[in-house]
């Protein structure tokens, strides 16, 4: 049987060695393989080499890959493709299958690495450790051209077996090296007696280790020292506490801390957090509360209950004696005002006094009895009422001096007659007596300005410097004026309690400042209640004021309309018209404007609750321009705008503009002005004429007589009530020329010429006793007096002027 097999083997070998006479080409082979695959004879995938001349199965490719890995331990996939001669794509795909099915292999960055390779590396590392005691994982990773994490992951399961070392902070250390460093850490830690940060301890240890290892030594990471320290602490080879992983407090220091705190607290009954910080205790409140459960934590100190009892006794005495106490004065200097305030709230006597409203805490540390505060407040309240009244009345107009100035040019004999006549013809009298030249006519305004210059120079400078700036409303100023300022309140408190002056007014924490802040709202409420009461009382007075103002304006405004009509006669003579317009604005118009502005100002003050004396509402007031402007600004809203327009018109040159603004202001104020109709005009003219006739009949001053005669002639001839100043008398006489006969006109012109001459002599006179002009003045006056009867006959005699 064996012989037969050997024979068959020889025949098969011969058949293989015999060269066939018919050979298949490469193309025929490829087509044959494809045909076999189509027929299903070959039912598995075939891969061809990169040369295309050989076929290889996937299983054979995996076997080739496994063989290379077993031989080399670590092989690159790219190198496998070159070695096996198969396309890289197929090699990568089969390599992944190989690694997936073999847990001992890993595919890392295009390389297949076996566990046997790592075992050999571990043995090499162990040999190197025996030489240098420590190796950095990063150094190994650089040599192996892999990541440090991979090296660390493969070394960790081999530590203590293949690798006789300890891995700490990316470093491999031998057991002997670890023991040596452990001894260093133990010795250094036991030598610390105060709280320390361990990171500061590791720096000198690193230097010591490097000096021990020489130039070949590698720097030791702090984490290695820290892990050794943590292990020693866990094994209780060191006593103390570790906080936040790095802050080490030895037990000896903690014991000394507690003894020091106990000693200070038992002696003083308090301990400050600052001293706790100096002792190295950062969380002082928690430490003290855990050690002294009966104590009380404050803002800056921790106290024993005996401190509260001591303060309670002192404050109780102050409250019972109707006095005050600064709690900080009985407490140590380390206590703050917040500490004092919290202690006061814990005092039983203070709690009961606050509940019964017998005491008050001001500024956190001051305790004042209610009786003490009331005594001071009652006195200040009385003075605050006086201050409010004085401040509210300070802005009212005092017209006495103004009235005397404005009436200087009215002769004494104009006071004769009834009060009713005075009221009707006040403006007429003021105008008709002005038979003086231009210089004398302007004497009154100039003197008023001169008197005001010295009195208001400083305020004028302030107004000039602030021109164009935004003004604070007068109403707000008046409201603020009646409220006493803080300085005033503090001064009154010092007057009542002189000892408060030692604290000073500038110190924001002084009892003086706190007491003033406490009393200020009370004073404001008191003053508001007073103003409310005054406002209620002012309601009837306001109605009476408006009624009186209406009556005054009714007659005055009708007279103003009457005088305005006479101006139409001089529209063709512009120079004279300007003089007449200005004269009427400065006399009658100024009087009724001042009456209205003053009345509205008083009404506004009453409306705002300001107490106004009864006499102030009845006085006749004549104001200057600045006072009118101040009163106008003192009004509210649109009323103020219209009042300012009235003041501006009064300073202008046209009476008609003034009349428009006056009507607007009166209408805005709720006042009704009567319009001059024919009937009223006849009545007023008749009364005016009658009054002038009476004055002409009784006039003894030759200078004043001329103006009254001219005015009476205008009524008789033109049926107009003319108000003419001295410098317009000549123009008025010229206007009468065509209406008078020659003798009457000559009488007027001669008398007017003599009057001007007399006034010129009087103006040039020095006033000395031996002045030679005195005789000339006397002679000229006697001449005028002799012509007075003839002048009167023009309006009173039998020969009346002829009307055309």
From Swiss-Prot:
Keyword annotations from UniProtKB, A to Z: Acetylation, Transferase, Ubl conjugation pathway
Comp. bias (Basic and acidic residues): 463-475
GO molecular function list: UFM1 ligase activity
Keyword field contains Acetylation: yes
Sequence intervals crossing the membrane: none
Disordered: region residues: 397-483
Enzyme Commission (EC) number: 2.3.2.-
Signal sequence region: none
Compositional bias ranges of the Low complexity kind: 400-409
GO process terms (BP): protein ufmylation
Record keyword Acetylation present: yes
Residues with PTM N-acetylmethionine: 1
Family according to the record: Belongs to the UFL1 family.
PANTHER family named in the record: E3 UFM1-PROTEIN LIGASE 1
Role description: E3 UFM1-protein ligase that mediates ufmylation of target proteins.
Protein name stated in the entry: E3 UFM1-protein ligase 1 homolog
């Amino acid at each position: 049987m064996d012989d037969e097999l050997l024979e068959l083997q020889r025949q098969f070998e011969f058949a293989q060695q015999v060269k066939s006479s018919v050979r298949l080409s490469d193309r025929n082979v490829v087509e044959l393989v494809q045909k076999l695959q189509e027929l299903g004879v070959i039912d598995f995938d075939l891969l061809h080499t990169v040369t295309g001349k050989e076929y290889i199965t996937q299983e054979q490719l995996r076997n080739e890959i496994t063989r290379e890995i077993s031989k080399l331990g670590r092989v690159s996939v790219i190198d496998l493709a070159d070695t096996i001669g198969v396309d890289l794509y197929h090699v990568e795909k089969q390599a992944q299958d190989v690694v997936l099915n073999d847990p001992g292999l890993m595919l890392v960055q295009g390389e297949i690495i076996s566990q046997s390779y790592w075992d050999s590396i571990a043995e090499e590392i162990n040999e190197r450790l025996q030489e240098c005691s420590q190796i950095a994982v990063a150094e190994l990773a650089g040599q192996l051209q892999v990541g440090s994490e991979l090296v660390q992951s493969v070394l960790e399961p081999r530590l203590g077996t293949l690798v006789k070392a300890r891995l700490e902070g990316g470093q491999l250390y031998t057991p002997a090296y670890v023991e040596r460093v452990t001894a260093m850490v133990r010795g250094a830690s036991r030598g610390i007696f105060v709280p320390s940060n361990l990171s500061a301890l590791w720096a000198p240890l690193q230097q010591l280790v490097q000096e021990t290892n020489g130039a070949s030594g590698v720097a030791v990471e702090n984490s290695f020292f820290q892990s050794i320290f943590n292990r020693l602490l866990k094994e209780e080879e060191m006593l103390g506490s570790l906080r936040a992983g790095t802050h080490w407090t030895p037990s000896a220091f903690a014991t000394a801390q507690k003894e020091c705190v106990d000693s200070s607290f038992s002696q003083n009954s308090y301990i400050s957090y600052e001293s706790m910080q100096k002792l190295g205790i950062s969380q002082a409140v928690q430490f003290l509360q855990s050690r002294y459960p009966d104590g009380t934590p404050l803002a800056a100190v921790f106290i024993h209950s005996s401190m509260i009892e001591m303060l309670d006794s002192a404050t109780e005495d102050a409250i019972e004696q109707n006095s005050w106490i600064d709690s900080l004065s009985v407490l140590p200097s380390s206590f703050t005002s917040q500490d004092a305030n919290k202690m006061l709230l814990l005092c039983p006597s203070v709690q009961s006094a606050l509940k019964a409203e017998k005491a008050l805490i001001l500024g956190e540390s001051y305790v004042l009895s209610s009786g003490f505060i009331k005594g001071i407040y009652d006195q200040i309240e009385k003075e605050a009422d006086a201050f409010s009244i004085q401040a509210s009345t300070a802005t009212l107009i005092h017209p006495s001096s103004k009235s005397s100035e404005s009436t200087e040019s009215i002769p004494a004999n104009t006071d004769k007659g009834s009060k009713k006549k005075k009221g009707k013809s006040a403006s007429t009298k003021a105008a008709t007596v002005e038979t003086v030249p231009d210089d004398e006519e302007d004497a009154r305004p100039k003197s008023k300005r001169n008197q005001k210059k010295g009195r208001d120079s400083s305020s004028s400078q302030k107004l000039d410097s602030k021109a164009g700036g935004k003004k604070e409303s007068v109403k707000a100023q008046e409201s603020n004026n009646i409220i006493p300022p803080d300085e005033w309140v503090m001064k009154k408190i010092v007057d009542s309690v002189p000892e408060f002056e030692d604290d000073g007014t500038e110190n924001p924490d002084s009892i003086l400042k706190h007491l003033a802040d406490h009393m200020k709202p009370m004073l404001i409420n008191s003053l508001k209640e007073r103003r409310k009461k005054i406002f209620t009382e002012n309601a009837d007075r306001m109605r009476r004021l408006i009624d009186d103002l209406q009556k005054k304006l009714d007659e005055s405004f009708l007279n103003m309309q009457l005088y305005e009509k006479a101006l139409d006669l001089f529209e063709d003579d512009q120079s004279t018209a300007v003089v007449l317009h200005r004269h009427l604005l400065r006399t009658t118009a100024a009087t009724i404007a001042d009456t209205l502005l003053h009345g509205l100002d008083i009404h506004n003050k009453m409306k705002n609750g300001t107490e106004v004396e009864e006499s102030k509402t009845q006085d006749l007031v004549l104001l200057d321009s600045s006072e009118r402007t101040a009163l106008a600004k003192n009004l509210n809203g649109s009323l103020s705008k219209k009042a300012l327009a009235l003041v501006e018109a009064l300073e202008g040159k046209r009476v008609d503009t003034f009349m428009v603004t006056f009507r607007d202001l009166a209408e805005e104020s709720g006042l009704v002005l009567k319009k001059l109709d024919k009937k009223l005009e006849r009545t007023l003219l008749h009364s005016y004429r009658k009054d002038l006739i009476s004055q002409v009949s009784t006039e003894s001053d030759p200078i004043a007589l001329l103006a009254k005669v001219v005015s009476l002639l205008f009524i008789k001839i033109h049926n107009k009530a003319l108000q003419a100043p001295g410098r317009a008398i000549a123009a008025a006489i010229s206007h009468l020329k065509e209406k008078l006969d020659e003798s009457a006109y000559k009488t007027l012109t001669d008398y007017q010429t003599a009057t001007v001459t007399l006034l010129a002599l009087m103006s040039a006179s020095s006033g000395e006793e031996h002045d030679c002009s005195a005789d000339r003045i006397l002679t000229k006056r006697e001449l005028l007096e002799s012509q007075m009867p003839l002048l009167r006959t023009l309006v009173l005699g039998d020969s009346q002027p002829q009307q055309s």
